[in-house]
């Protein structure tokens, strides 16, 4: 298992502008995602991410380059996995259940908590609205790969609510 060094942003919290968080994450180490999670889908886009935390939240920024992008789902807890998306999983030491955060390229979120995909319960839409995000899509060069970034700030208070 790879260990990540996660920086503490002492100047940032859930009230910090997401654009400022995005800028700060640009100076952090980029971690490459280089494994295809499903055998039957062998397409591997170029994906990196940066991670840090503040006094009351965790910050993530994804940097993605791929052939095509799709963003059809705009409501919370809809099938963003059918769109161009990224995921983040977190489990706390004393629990069997984990959180699964899925974000499409425009920031629509699907968030669940459970011990497996089959028994996951979805977070309430009002809780999801506490997560700040910024999406940037740059597809101004026809015929070339599409590039997008997504920055999110996930409040620690969400992890205290086990649906």
Q: What do the PLM-derived regions correspond to, one by one?
A:
Residues 1-161:
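Structural preference for beta-rich elements and adjacent junctions enriched in aromatics
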């Amino acid at each position: 298992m790879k260990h990540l060094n996660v920086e503490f942003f002492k100047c940032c919290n859930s009230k910090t502008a997401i654009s400022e968080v995005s800028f700060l994450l640009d100076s952090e180490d980029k971690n490459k995602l280089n494994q295809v999670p499903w055998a039957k889908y062998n397409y591997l886009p170029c994906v990196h991410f940066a991670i840090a935390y503040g006094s009351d939240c965790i910050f993530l920024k994804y940097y993605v380059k791929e052939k095509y992008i799709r963003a059809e789902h705009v409501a919370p807890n809809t099938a963003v996995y059918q769109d161009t998306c990224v995921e983040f999983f977190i489990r706390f030491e004393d629990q069997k259940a984990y959180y699964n955060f899925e974000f499409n390229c425009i920031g629509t979120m699907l968030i669940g908590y459970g011990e497996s995909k089959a028994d996951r319960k979805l977070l309430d839409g009002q809780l999801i609205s506490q997560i700040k995000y910024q999406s940037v899509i740059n597809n101004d060069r026809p015929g070339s790969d599409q590039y997008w970034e997504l920055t999110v700030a996930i409040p620690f208070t969400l992890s205290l609510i086990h649906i």
